[in-house]
């Protein structure tokens, strides 16, 4: 009897060990990287929430790939928007043997990190990095599901001149890969138009005092100030513009196109004064799916979507769709499928060109009224 009991116990332990091993083999680890600390932590958390929402939904429904059942695990990391920390985190994810990465959040961290993922053969989809260089380094593992700065800068310049009737434009950029890249594209597209650049100034992504550059700009009498940078800087800048009596309109890209701008600007923001563009958007026929996502997001997290949560959500679902079509979560096997995929998401159909840029990317132009973001139009 004791021998039988011992045998049963050993069998149970062996079964438990086998079950544990099987569970480990059935786990797919997806990395997510954004700045979840620092000045743009609110935007980073927005991205992370979008990815986490996708993971939770997939796990709730059950995931089968190649006839095997899997469970997704999101390994969320913080790069603080710092390129050096971004590469450190990227190597950490490679060492953790993640099956794919959603991120990084901004261009300054996505670009250096992309080399590390490429060397490891790990697919990476950024839901928000817009600098063209990110997908032009020859790395077949780098993708993005938002428009790039060439598209964004061109659309904003066109809107500024044709709709906003701007004629004298001052430009400020924060010297980051994102801010400088966007400002350069905007300036390039203004040249040859009926408008002209009357002043070009520089700041940093951590600055809080803009008195000197705004005083210089005021003397040039612009009717529009274009800012290449993030909302954490744009808000205080708008407040100081009012203090100096600068009544120009204010324009920027996706980095300053969140509901945080009115909060940071306070009474420095007039209704309709700010025009910004999100490097993504949906056609009217796709609006319901996006609205449903926003409602579900608010129910889950208790806050509204800021900017790129739906793109992080779609990026993760697109990656998993590629795994399912390939019949394997092995990066080497699903990467070729990801490159040619067409995934119907809440932000529209996600498909990539030969460089890894999203095909047929649209942009959404917004303003702010009553402290809330208001959509004006969708552009290509």
Kindly label every feature range from the protein language model.
Residues 19-21:
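N-terminal signal peptide c-region/cleavage motif recognized by signal peptidases
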């Amino acid at each position: 009897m004791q021998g039988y009991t011992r045998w049963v116990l050993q069998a149970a332990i062996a079964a438990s060990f086998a079950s544990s091993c099987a569970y480990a083999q059935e786990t797919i680890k997806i990395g997510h990287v954004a700045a979840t600390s620092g000045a743009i932590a609110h935007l980073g958390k927005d991205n992370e929430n979008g990815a986490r929402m996708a993971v939770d939904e997939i796990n709730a429904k059950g995931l089968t790939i190649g006839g095997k059942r899997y469970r997704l695990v999101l390994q969320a990391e913080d790069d603080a928007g710092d390129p050096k920390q971004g590469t450190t985190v990227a190597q950490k994810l490679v060492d953790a043997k993640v099956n794919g990465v959603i991120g990084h959040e901004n261009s300054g961290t996505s670009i250096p990190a992309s080399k590390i993922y490429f060397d490891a053969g790990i697919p990476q989809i950024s839901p928000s990095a817009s600098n063209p260089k990110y997908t032009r380094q020859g790395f077949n593992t780098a993708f993005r599901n938002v428009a790039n700065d060439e598209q964004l800068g061109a659309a904003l310049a066109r809107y500024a001149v044709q709709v906003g009737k701007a004629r004298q434009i001052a430009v400020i950029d924060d010297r980051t890969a994102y801010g400088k890249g966007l400002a350069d594209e905007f300036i390039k597209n203004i040249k040859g138009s009926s408008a002209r650049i009357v002043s070009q100034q520089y700041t940093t992504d951590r600055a809080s005092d803009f008195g000197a550059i705004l005083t210089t700009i005021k003397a040039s009498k612009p009717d529009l100030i274009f800012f290449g940078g993030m909302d954490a800087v744009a808000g205080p800048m708008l407040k100081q513009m009012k203090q100096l009596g600068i009544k120009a309109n204010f324009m920027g890209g996706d980095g300053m196109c969140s509901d945080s701008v009115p909060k940071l600007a306070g009474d420095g923001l007039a209704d309709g004064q700010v025009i910004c563009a999100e490097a993504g958007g949906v056609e009217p026929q796709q609006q319901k799916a996006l609205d449903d996502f926003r409602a579900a997001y608010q129910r889950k997290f208790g806050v509204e979507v800021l900017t790129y949560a739906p793109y992080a959500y779609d990026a993760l679902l697109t990656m998993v769709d590629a795994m399912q079509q390939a019949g394997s979560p092995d990066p080497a096997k699903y990467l070729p499928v990801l490159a040619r995929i067409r995934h119907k998401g809440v932000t529209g159909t996600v498909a990539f060109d030969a460089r890894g840029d999203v095909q047929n990317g649209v942009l959404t132009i917004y303003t702010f009224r009553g402290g809330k973001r208001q959509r004006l139009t969708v552009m290509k």
